[in-house]
Amino acid sequence: MIMKKKQPGLPQYDSPLMDADSIRNSLSAHMTFSISKFPFSATTRDWYESAAFAIRDRLVERWMETMQAYYREDSKRIYYLSLEFLVGRTFSNAMLNLNIHEECKAALYELGQDIETISDIEFDAALGNGGLGRLAACFLDSMASLNLPCYGYGIRYEYGMFHQAIEDGMQVEHPDNWLRYGNPWEFPRPEVLYPVKLYGKVVGYKHEDGTTHHHWVDTEDIMAMAYDTPVPGYGGKTVNNMRLWSAKSSRDFDLRYFNQGNYIQAVADKNESENLSKVLYPDDSTEMGKELRLKQQYFFVSASLQDILFRYKKHHTSWDELPDKVAIQLNDTHPSIGIAELMRLLMDTHHLPWERAWSLTSKTFSYTNHTLMPEALETWPVSLFENLLPRHLEIIYEINHRFLRDVMHHFPGDSDLLRRMSIISEDGGDRRIRMAHLAIVAATPLTAWRSCIPN
């Protein structure tokens, strides 16, 4: 049983229905055309992937309709930036939200398969490890269920966290290679590719209007490639998008080194670049580990903001409406470097003056803090920013200068208050950037989300 879809703006196709017979037919077709196996030789994983593709077919249609509706209505979108998304297993969640669990169970039973056995094959997506990631996943699920236009942005970790085991009485860690067999729920988007700059130096120049602008030059560039995953709300009416970034080298293979017999160096740049999206929370007990963590945070934030601005500019010629169409939520301090990055993009790429860029930025970001413990409030050495993100350090200095000037105006003579409220900590001579302070200074109240809620 199939129903012909004739919705304007979408490709014309035969739409699969939600009954058990249609699901069984889809599953059998995918076993042949997607997996390319006979049922008698198929493994349990083959059956899982065939079933996942059959369910995904029913998600994609609603996903495309949801995205088209957002563009058609020019909806204000919520962009949820998080270093973690502990989404769990998509197979059971998708069946539940589409209300087709029993139909899938019956379809698999008719093919001689048990749905519980099939469900157990799926790996947990190693995209988070605790409450922070679970909260982010719940937010995406809830916003889809409430029909809110939302995108999740994060990193597509290749190994995520690690499996822990006890060997000879000692705790050991093994990589969680959750992508070993691929991921049937994601869609690679190789055409969605953004450069992310690191290191380099900043040079000033005079614009044609006489104002001073800045170039960030001599940088090392890493490419961010998008992978999209549909996020269905309960009932399946709205299917939002989670876009995760994978690091790709801008210099994949150096043939010169290879021809000289230096095979390791030939792929060294590629390997170093792609380390950014290998592991969630790399060990930061060393200086290299700290740098890798900050690189990770900036990598996904920069790619996400470039993507957000690209989407906005496709339908708007003026920046004035940015806060009315874009709400960016920072999940803890990890993505708070996005404040300086949005300022950089607006000023250096789109040539907006400081005052206008700051007005737009401070009306666009919201921030959620999860703890008040000092050890959990992220700070970074100024020296690390000087080396890795020199332009952002300049912007943070200017934000702090203007903020402290306002504090001094309202509380004259209170030098201790200035010290405590400054974005730059100088305790013990160790100058550090307090990311929670930066997020609070720039963020708007969460009531800004209300304009995203349909009447």
Residue ranges and their predicted role:
Residues 2-455:
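A conserved ligand/cofactor-binding region detector
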